[in-house]
């Protein structure tokens, strides 16, 4: 087995049976004090985000509620258990919210489910005191313009789907990558920056596009064009990406002497010192809109208001879980011209459905096409899961994505932004 096969075998190490595929989600949110200040992550004298995380971790222990983690700017992330049924996932989501609200209320804290911090510059937000994130911060300073914004001031909803086999992995990643402009529009919820409305700028999407050209963006931007070779192409790609950190003998992140992921993994593979944890750490240093771990992860969704968090899960699940939809999308997307796809990806930075899309159709046409397919797939499952998407979709089609809806309501309110958001 060569190195590429070793990496690929790790990605394909937790295959599910076709009828047993599950989905899990990761939900990030910001936390503010009662005075509407971001909760610090490193306070020495006051209750901070680190204390909050530890309290949540203890409260969730043994309750099968999922797990909590702490993001670099103090955002709280919850990871659900995996489920095959979105109604069961919803039950888990409600348990998480109840536990989070109970804990926040004890300390007069407020959560905010939004894609980008509406008020603060990244310079005003402490970075968590962890080696991994300090190394990441240093890397972002050298390799992009908005990495500090990404680390400190963004929150998202991420989806993790089981892989069935290699062909499934290739085709799903290709389909999800092609869907990026659609999901980026439907699930945009970043209306404000530094206290000001952003107009029709798709802000969180824009921040990620300008974070690190080597490890972000779409798979298409890194030469992954064809579904049949996508996983092999992905393995070749990750080997070229600059390495942020490596793991020491105790599996803790440390500064690395290697230039790229491939340099480190090759060296350890040749010396028979390569561990599965080294491969896993390398895969987690890739931030494309869709990426492989031992799952397929969808990463291009803004954090949405709590009541809408399952909307993107339903949208993607109506496609991922439905063979008919996957075949139809694979057939359609395989016809698209690469340059058209690149132009459409750029169009997703602006919230305007009147723009042109691929194959002679408008942005609007493709949003409707994909959404209707998703709903039909959900209905074929017969679990009433379409309820999590249909009303949300109708609102977005009629009034624009939440980024635009929020700004319109704010301008009509005549209130200060703080009062509008927190009241």
Predicted regions and their residues:
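Loop-rich catalytic cores of soluble enzymes, especially ATP-dependent carboxylate-amine ligases
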Residues: 116-291
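An exposure/low-complexity boundary signal
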Residues: 221-246, 361-389
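Solvent-exposed residues in well-ordered beta-strands and their adjoining turns
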Residues: 32-33, 81, 162-164, 301
């Amino acid at each position: 087995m060569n190195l590429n096969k070793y990496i690929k075998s790790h990605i394909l190490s937790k295959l599910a049976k076709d009828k047993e595929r599950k989905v899990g989600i990761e939900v990030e949110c910001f936390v503010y004090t009662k005075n509407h200040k971001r909760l610090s992550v490193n306070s020495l004298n006051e209750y901070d985000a680190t204390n909050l995380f530890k309290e949540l971790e203890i409260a969730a222990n043994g309750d099968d509620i999922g797990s909590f983690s702490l993001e670099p700017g103090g955002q709280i992330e919850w990871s659900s258990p995996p489920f095959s049924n979105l109604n069961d996932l919803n039950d888990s989501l409600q348990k998480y919210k109840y536990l989070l609200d109970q804990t926040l209320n004890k300390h007069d804290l407020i959560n905010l489910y939004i894609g980008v911090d509406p008020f603060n510059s990244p310079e005003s937000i402490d970075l968590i005191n962890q080696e991994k994130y300090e190394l990441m911060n240093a890397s972002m300073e050298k390799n992009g313009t908005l990495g500090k914004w990404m680390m400190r001031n963004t929150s998202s909803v991420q989806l993790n789907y089981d892989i069935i086999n290699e062909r499934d992995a290739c085709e799903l990643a290709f389909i999800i990558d092609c869907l990026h402009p659609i999901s980026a529009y439907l699930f945009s919820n970043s209306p404000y920056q530094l206290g000001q409305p952003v107009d029709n700028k798709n802000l969180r999407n824009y921040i990620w596009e300008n974070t690190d050209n080597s490890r972000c963006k779409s798979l298409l931007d890194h030469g992954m064009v064809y579904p049949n070779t996508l996983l092999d192409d992905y393995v070749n790609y990750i080997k070229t990406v600059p390495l942020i950190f490596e793991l020491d003998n105790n599996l803790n992140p440390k500064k690395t002497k290697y230039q790229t992921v491939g340099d480190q993994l090759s060296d350890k593979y040749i010396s028979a010192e390569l561990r599965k944890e080294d491969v896993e750490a390398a895969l987690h240093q890739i931030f494309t809109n869709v990426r492989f771990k031992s799952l397929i992860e969808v990463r291009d969704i803004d954090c949405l208001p709590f009541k809408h968090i399952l909307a993107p899960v339903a949208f993607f699940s109506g496609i991922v879980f439905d063979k008919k939809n996957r075949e139809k999308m694979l057939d359609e997307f395989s016809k698209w011209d690469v340059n058209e796809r690149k132009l459409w990806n750029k169009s997703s930075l602006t919230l305007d459905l009147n723009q042109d899309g691929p194959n002679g159709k408008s942005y609007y046409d493709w949003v409707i096409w994909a959404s209707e397919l998703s709903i039909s797939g959900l209905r074929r499952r017969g679990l009433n899961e379409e309820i999590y998407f249909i009303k949300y979709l109708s609102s977005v089609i009629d009034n624009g994505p939440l980024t635009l809806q929020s700004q319109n309501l704010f301008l009509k309110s005549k209130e200060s932004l703080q009062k509008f958001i927190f009241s």
